[in-house]
Amino acid sequence: MNQNLHTLSDETVAIVLTKLEPISTFLKDENLFEIVINRPYQVMTEGVEGWKTIETPALSFNELMGIAKVVASYSKQNISEKNPILSATLPGNERIQIVIPPAVEKNTISMTIRKPSSRSFSLEDLANKGLFSVCEQVSFTPLNNYLSHLSELKHIDHDLVRAYAKKDFVFFLNQAVQCQKNILIAGKTGSGKTTLSKALIAKIPDDERIITIEDTPELVVPQPNYVSMIYSKDGQGLASVGPKELLESALRMRPDRILLQELRDGTAFYYIRNVNSGHPGSITTVHASTALAAFEQMTLLVKESEGGGDLERDDIRGLLISMIDIIIQCKRIEGKFKVTEIYYDPFKQRNIFGGN
């Protein structure tokens, strides 16, 4: 890197860290998940013991506006009355969402900081911590038909069906990744979707070339042959490229897998394009309340996108059912990440028993 650019980058980071000094204790606390500011002079944190409120005299409205401006500058974006919403990543890799007036009440500022896990857990680690202790199988086809109709499936699915039927979810998911099944991880914000996606990505063989597409750098890819591509959310940033442009570029980059980190807005349509382009093995996330509701949420997202607006809802849903192999529903229960449901229905996917 050019020495002047390196120095400029270091100076910008130093300015950001100085501005964040009033909340630095919370940023360093490994027991916290979220740090939120709803109004001046007050910080709320969420950890294993739930929410706590801390009065913070240093965080005046002007001081918070100063933080917003510095974070915008650091992330090569802009925040103003015309552009009152900012999504960025802090120097410590924390994700921050900032909303200023007039998008929030006058004299208030909203800041939501998502802290990344201080370490990456393997799938086995998560299972030993009780990740699957309350997990249920979810499907359209009755579960008691799975083993009795095994011969109607491709051989590659036989081990998966057996593991799924006996709730051996670690083996099931490990095999699913190895077999390049398309996996969708669903849940609300803070439910452990990213933690689980990191564990699954770690199971991808080292000889595969991986391209990730995100709006905020968050995924950890341990494989040596990978490229992390970043798009500008809402057209902000130095380069006004979106997921569509990055996907088109990724398809020319000799990928074995293309991983779109989170599906929302138009990215759901590009997810379909990605899978249909002959690049299975996707591992991605979406906000949904249940595993089956993820199909409806995805249908809605595709329908609302520019590319999917002319498609019929039933056609979109049918396409999603045929493409998505596995849906994992995540939830935080009493401060612990849990998988509450796993959808896997190769019979419905292949329309073996017919029906809608």
Curated annotation (Swiss-Prot):
Domain of life: Bacteria
Gene name tied to this protein: virB11
Biological processes annotated in GO: secretion by the type IV secretion system
Name of the protein in question: Type IV secretion system protein VirB11
Compartment(s): Cell inner membrane
One GO molecular-function entry: ATP binding
GO cellular component: plasma membrane; type IV secretion system complex
Quaternary assembly: Interacts with VirB9.
Binding site for ATP: 187-194
SUPFAM superfamilies found in the cross-reference section: P-loop containing nucleoside triphosphate hydrolases
